[in-house]
A protein has these predicted regions:
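Hydrophobic residues embedded in beta-strands of well-ordered beta-sheets
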Residues: 21-23, 42, 51, 114-115, ...
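Extracytoplasmic/luminal low-complexity segments enriched in Pro/Gly and acidic/polar residues
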Residues: 121-178
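Flexible glycine-/small-residue-rich
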Residues: 17, 25-31, 66-69, 118-120, ...
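Extracytoplasmic
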Residues: 8, 18-22, 38-42, 46-47, ...
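Soluble extracytoplasmic domains of inner/organellar membrane proteins
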Residues: 80-138
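Extracytoplasmic segments of membrane-associated envelope/inner-membrane machinery
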Residues: 25-106
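Short secondary-structure junctions
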Residues: 5-11, 92-103, 142-147
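Membrane-embedded segments
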Residues: 3-31, 50
């Protein structure tokens, strides 16, 4: 059997002959790692920045990406942005979150800095995302036990022993009253 081209929204397609009269077709779709809003539509993109789906219903567990102006959001075409460097960092953050099996509700780009929102915690990653920074999240989030605030990973390095966490003011007042 010959090979043809695969549609951009598919990761892999395999066709097998099961018997002389039947075939098995297996299709693996590209998984979205984030989405942006385009009016009332949710525009989902994969780890390469390719728009893999557009719809009016949100998919649970995929983070909203805010703060980047995108020129075009056409289905099966790459997202184009003037801020390609920071967009690359956002894609990297999405990939690393997926590897760590973490779900961020939102990824925000503000003044060339990246922020993740995981539950009640805002994680400040700075201008560059590294796998080491994201790898710190699971144990830290477990220790925070639902506290609200900002976790500062923008200056994190492997030889750093402490990572600053600013408790949200309302949470701090409640704990002082008790």
């Amino acid at each position: 059997m010959g090979k043809g081209s695969t549609l951009p929204c598919f990761e892999k397609i395999t066709v097998r002959l099961k018997a002389p009269w039947s075939i098995q077709i297996t299709v693996k779709e590209k998984q979205p790692v984030g989405y942006m809003m385009d009016g009332q539509n949710y525009v989902y993109f994969d780890e390469e920045g390719l728009v893999v789906e557009k719809g009016t219903i949100p998919i649970e567990g995929i983070p909203l990406v805010e703060g980047i102006n995108v020129k075009t959001m056409e289905e099966y075409k790459p997202l184009k942005s003037d801020a390609s460097g920071i967009f690359g960092e956002i894609l990297k953050a999405s990939q690393e979150l997926k590897k760590q099996k973490l779900a961020a509700e939102k990824i925000v780009c503000e003044k060339e800095r990246i922020y993740l929102y995981v539950g009640n915690v805002c994680v400040s990653l700075g201008a560059h995302v590294t796998s080491e920074k994201i790898a710190q999240l699971p144990p830290i989030l477990e220790k925070l036990q639902g506290q609200a605030g900002t976790l500062h990973l923008e200056n994190y390095s492997e030889d750093q022993e402490t990572i600053p966490f600013d408790v949200k003011v309302e949470e701090q007042k409640k704990s002082e009253e008790n």
